[in-house]
């Protein structure tokens, strides 16, 4: 049975990544916390697939909205940084990613995917998990999708904004509406 994570401290991580500059570097939850940033951490199964580029590029296309909300976006798969870079360097018209505005991290030892409960052990790939972590490192939101279904960026932004209100948000709440 899966352990509850929401409301608890999120598992800490540091991973190699391809940064928005296309340089290799590292990303960590600690760095986001030190910078007083929210973290939108999402896992996807693998590079060079069909659904993944649609959601990865959609998140990048809306990155400025996340940035306006003091949130850093980090995409994660179990692929290597070299595979990530090759995919980023592939044009979107050819099922590539093109330039991204946030890092893609490489969880090659599967440790982070396992700690967040999204690793499909027998396949060595992650489910589509989405985790929103506040600047204090507390996991505020988690959802896991079947790998055939891409995420909704509008919903991710709505949930992030709802969490940032600090209030009670009723069903179908939209940014700008009153909380309870």
From Swiss-Prot:
Its EC number is 1.11.1.-. Residues 4-165 form the Thioredoxin domain. The active site is at 52 (cysteine sulfenic acid (-soh) intermediate). GO terms for molecular function: thioredoxin peroxidase activity. GO terms for biological process: cell redox homeostasis; hydrogen peroxide catabolic process; response to oxidative stress. It is an enzyme of class 1 (oxidoreductase). The keyword Transport does not apply. The keyword Metal-binding does not apply. It catalyses: a hydroperoxide + [protein]-dithiol = [protein]-disulfide + an alcohol + H2O. PROSITE patterns: THIOREDOXIN_2. It is found in: Cytoplasm. Coiled coil: none annotated. One of its GO terms (cellular component) is cytosol. Keywords: Antioxidant, Cytoplasm, Disulfide bond, Oxidoreductase, Peroxidase, Redox-active center. Thiol-specific peroxidase that catalyzes the reduction of hydrogen peroxide and organic hydroperoxides to water and alcohols, respectively. Plays a role in cell protection against oxidative stress by detoxifying peroxides. Belongs to the peroxiredoxin family. AhpC/Prx1 subfamily. The active site is a conserved redox-active cysteine residue, the peroxidatic cysteine (C(P)), which makes the nucleophilic attack on the peroxide substrate. The peroxide oxidizes the C(P)-SH to cysteine sulfenic acid (C(P)-SOH), which then reacts with another cysteine residue, the resolving cysteine (C(R)), to form a disulfide bridge. The disulfide is subsequently reduced by an appropriate electron donor to complete the catalytic cycle. In this typical 2-Cys peroxiredoxin, C(R) is provided by the other dimeric subunit to form an intersubunit disulfide. PANTHER family: ALKYL HYDROPEROXIDE REDUCTASE C, THIOREDOXIN PEROXIDASE. Homodimer; disulfide-linked, upon oxidation. This is Putative peroxiredoxin YkuU.
């Amino acid at each position: 049975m899966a352990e509850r994570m929401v409301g608890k401290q999120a598992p800490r991580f540091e991973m190699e990544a391809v940064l928005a500059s296309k340089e290799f570097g590292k990303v960590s939850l600690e760095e986001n916390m030190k910078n007083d940033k929210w973290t939108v951490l999402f896992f996807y199964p693998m590079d060079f697939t069909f659904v993944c580029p649609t959601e990865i590029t959609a998140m990048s296309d809306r990155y400025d909205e996340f940035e306006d909300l003091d949130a850093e976006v980090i995409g994660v798969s179990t692929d290597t940084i070299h595979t990530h870079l090759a995919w980023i360097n592939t044009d979107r018209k050819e099922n590539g990613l093109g330039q991204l505005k946030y890092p893609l991290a490489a969880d090659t030892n599967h440790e982070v995917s396992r700690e967040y409960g999204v690793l499909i052990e027998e396949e060595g790939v992650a489910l589509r998990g989405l985790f929103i972590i506040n600047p204090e490192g507390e996991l505020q939101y988690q959802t896991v999708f079947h790998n055939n279904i891409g995420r909704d960026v509008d919903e991710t932004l709505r949930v992030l904004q709802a969490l940032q209100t600090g209030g009670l948000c009723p069903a179908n709440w939209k940014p700008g509406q009153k909380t309870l």
